[in-house]
Amino acid sequence: MAEAEYFIWIAPEGDFEEEFGNITRMLPTGEYFSPCKRVPMTNRQAVVVFYALVFLLSLLGNSLVMLVILYRRRTRSVTDVYVLNLAIADLLFSLTLPFLAVSKWKGWIFGTPLCKMVSLLKEVNFFSGILLLACISVDRYLAIVHATRTLTRKRYLVKFVCMGTWGLSLVLSLPFAIFRQAYKPYRSGTVCYEVLGEATADLRITLRGLSHIFGFLLPLFIMLVCYGLTLRTLFKAHMRQKRRAMWVIFAVVLVFLLCCLPYNLVLLSDTLLGAHLIQDTCERRNNIDQALYITEILGFSHSCLNPVIYAFVGQSFRHEFLKILANLVHKEVLTHHSASFRTSLTTIY
């Protein structure tokens, strides 16, 4: 194999996390590199604050979504099971944000085991998110276009579908965790990064390609086809009630695409660059790195947006949440009156 071409310049101050946080190609480890000066990423303080805000909103919002769905056990639908799994995925991802925020500020100080764990949770969240949305699109298509309660509508089978989705997400995410480790490049701070040699570079490109196909392009195609056919049926049959019920799902899918599609398109360009299918130049590399930096932040924000959609678009969610809140207040009032009554009896007798 021909030697890999490197257009990399290490900043003298050694701020690797800021300069190279989103590079996905193989890193050189020697002292001399091709002189390609990188444009530094700025506003790290703002990024850290943003991560902290997303973490808090995601933790609170997704916990409430899980509470509402678990509370309505008797009336829980198939779609609710998928939404519950979406909330779990976003909640797990939010747990990685404190580590990512610290790494933006101080570099990776948590060692290789946590580097692998955080990378795994981050990737599993993304893959499981889009795969679960694809499952929801198929479920809605079968329920509305074919107007049937097939075997896929049975709750026990849906649980197996969700388990399969998590399993596939784990398989697609494993390469990212396997290759990542706490790495200290020449004249730079430690970073959680994929350390690859020349022998594994082609394997990594292949794995990235498979991830793009099975973890993004194929589920996206399934969603577009299923929702296209579902929308056509809804408008032809004038199903107003079902059309209103679909707005929440459409909003969830739309927000997911707006947040995650830009990052994946840039990541696909980065993969093509690493595979030498498009010419690697300093200007192109810098443009892709900056685009990855920005679109990744946009993608992270998705983990806290679904609960907002359920709250403002989903009438059923608001009703159930207010019902839970009313029950809690009612129990608190009863407990207070009961305690007051016991105190009065004790005082009298």
From Swiss-Prot:
Residues 1-44, 102-116, 180-204, 270-290 are extracellular. Disulfide bonds join C115-C192. The chain crosses the membrane at residues 45-71, 81-101, 117-138, 160-179, 205-225, 248-269, 291-313. Its main location: membrane. The keyword Membrane applies. Residues 72-80, 139-159, 226-247, 314-349 are cytoplasmic. Glycans are attached at N22. GO terms for molecular function: C-C chemokine binding; C-C chemokine receptor activity; interleukin-8 binding; interleukin-8 receptor activity. GO terms for cellular component: external side of plasma membrane. Belongs to the G-protein coupled receptor 1 family. Interacts with IL8. Interacts with GNAI2. This is C-X-C chemokine receptor type 1. The gene is Cxcr1.
